[in-house]
């Protein structure tokens, strides 16, 4: 049986991690091998790169440096976690992947989408997620949720304009490829969001069997 690669995307405070855990629980109840992972990160080396990316520092990080670090972490993550899990037939649930790069570095930072696409092909080859869930909510709601968690990381310290661009980039990608994306209203109560997530499980099982 081939594996299934599902990514969960969205801006700050959208509840990706909570819903990833919920989806994993529901899939494991059906006897499936589920791997939970995240980006940036997912391996010891990639997690160290994550710290560089998220920790505020005195030295400003050049946008090209940020982009290359993201893909360096991704290359390690793919080699050590994602590809092996898919090869054994697991369902991989990943909190962020390359759509986040298009949204944050492309939309938020304004980097060339062509440059991102070149790195995507170099690092990933033809590997793309089978299904991407975008947890969408108003920027001010997401930032308020992020602030309530405590100290903000380097990205969470960006302003409204940055995150409006991130949100717009996500929705544009979903509109451009509706067969791969499902947009979930993350501004609802958690139980309503989880009902929407659970409603997608039959589709996931069909994709897994294809």
Curated annotation (Swiss-Prot):
GO molecular function list: ATP binding; dTMP kinase activity
GO biological process terms, semicolon-separated: dTDP biosynthetic process; dTTP biosynthetic process; dUDP biosynthetic process
Pfam families, A to Z: Thymidylate_kin
Gene3D superfamilies: P-loop containing nucleotide triphosphate hydrolases (3.40.50.300)
Keywords for this protein: ATP-binding, Kinase, Nucleotide biosynthesis, Nucleotide-binding, Transferase
Residues that, per the record, bind ATP: 10-17
InterPro entries named in the record: P-loop_NTPase, Thymidylate_kin-like_dom, Thymidylate_kinase
Signal peptide start and end residues: none
GO cellular component, one term: cytosol
Catalyses which reaction(s): dTMP + ATP = dTDP + ADP
Enzyme Commission number(s) of this protein: 2.7.4.9
Cited function: Phosphorylation of dTMP to form dTDP in both de novo and salvage pathways of dTTP synthesis.
PANTHER family linked: THYMIDYLATE KINASE, UMP-CMP KINASE 2, MITOCHONDRIAL
HAMAP family: Thymidylate_kinase
UniProt family annotation: Belongs to the thymidylate kinase family.
Protein name: Thymidylate kinase
Provenance organism: Stutzerimonas stutzeri (strain A1501) (Pseudomonas stutzeri)
